[in-house]
Amino acid sequence: MTEQEKTSAVVEETREAVDTTSQPVATEKKSKNNTALILSAVAIAIALAAGIGLYGWGKQQAVNQTATSDALANQLTALQKAQESQKAELEGIIKQQAAQLKQANRQQETLAKQLDEVQQKVATISGSDAKTWLLAQADFLVKLAGRKLWSDQDVTTAAALLKSADASLADMNDPSLITVRRAITDDIASLSAVSQVDYDGIILKLNQLSNQVDNLRLADNDSDGSPMDSDGEELSSSISEWRINLQKSWQNFMDNFITIRRRDDTAVPLLAPNQDIYLRENIRSRLLVAAQAVPRHQEETYRQALENVSTWVRAYYDTDDATTKAFLDEVDQLSQQNISMDLPETLQSQAMLEKLMQTRVRNLLAQPAAGTTEAKPAPAPQADTPAAAPQGE
């Protein structure tokens, strides 16, 4: 081969090598261009999606804000209506309270006028006729004396109250009261003539009898002795004399087989040991009833209780015993004691003082005070009073 041919061959080989090398480079560039296009498309898609999402979110937020604004507007409207309703109710209450306050002021003015009238009357009584108070005091004391006399039968306290009433009339130094004072003196004299009863003493005696009940001795039917209580002959203790002892015992038995006793009075009934306790307690209870009847002035109850005590003691206890005799004597004396007093039915001075109170004190209080008007304020018109406020507010 020539040198020219060799050179041509080298050139062809070089071209082939260059062509072979340029083909991968073009392929690589084409692949890079495709990747860039894909990435651009993805970026554009992402941007479009983000824009669409952002637009939708903004639109939803706008819708939510619109709904919230509408709800707030509705609430505000409701609050305004409620406020207006409460305002109207408060205005009604204020008007009602104002009317009530006005009426209360009118009533207060009326009461103030009445109080002024009373004060003027009191000033008139205390200034012009101060002695009238002494007359009222005497009238009260006489009425209290009558209450003590007829309710409590306390003659001593009633007489003391009448003396105090007479002293009050004496302090008035009024000659026109001589008749009343004379009546009070007569009432005191009539009370002094009343025979008083020692109620406390009677009650103490009844209590003493109650304490002596346990000392009473029960009646014994065999207290007069029995033929079996004493033997005419004593038995021997010797065994050898058994025949004689047997004969004596038989003789005593035959002598006492039939016994005849003579009694001039009725037999006293015997009590069992457990019944004795009940009898004593019954006697104490009747004595207590009699003691309670004394301050109550229950004459029939008092005498009936003591009669029961006397009957039971005479029936079941030994009347020959000294303690029983003293007990019965005290019961008989107390049963004859009068526990009610012969009191006057009326007090002469009471009616006289009542008449004086009518003419002097009560007529003076009934007179209108000077400087006061008889005109009374007109009642408040009903139209000024609004309807009552609801109770639930």
Swiss-Prot record:
GO cellular component entries: plasma membrane
Subcellular location field: Cell inner membrane
Domain of life: Bacteria
Keywords attached to this entry: Cell inner membrane, Cell membrane, Membrane, Transmembrane, Transmembrane helix
Pfam family name, one: HemX
TM spans (from-to): 37-57
Keyword Protease: no
InterPro entries reported in the protein's UniProt record: HemX
Comp. bias regions, Low complexity: 375-393
Membrane topology type: Single-pass membrane protein
Biased composition annotated in UniProt, kind: Basic and acidic residues: 1-18
Region named Disordered: 1-30, 366-393
Other facts noted in the record for this chain: Was suggested to be a uroporphyrinogen-III methyltransferase, but the function of the protein has not been experimentally determined.
Assembly description: Homooligomer, possibly a homopentamer.
Name the UniProt record assigns to this protein: Protein HemX
Species: Escherichia coli (strain K12)
Lineage per the UniProt record: Bacteria, Pseudomonadati, Pseudomonadota, Gammaproteobacteria, Enterobacterales
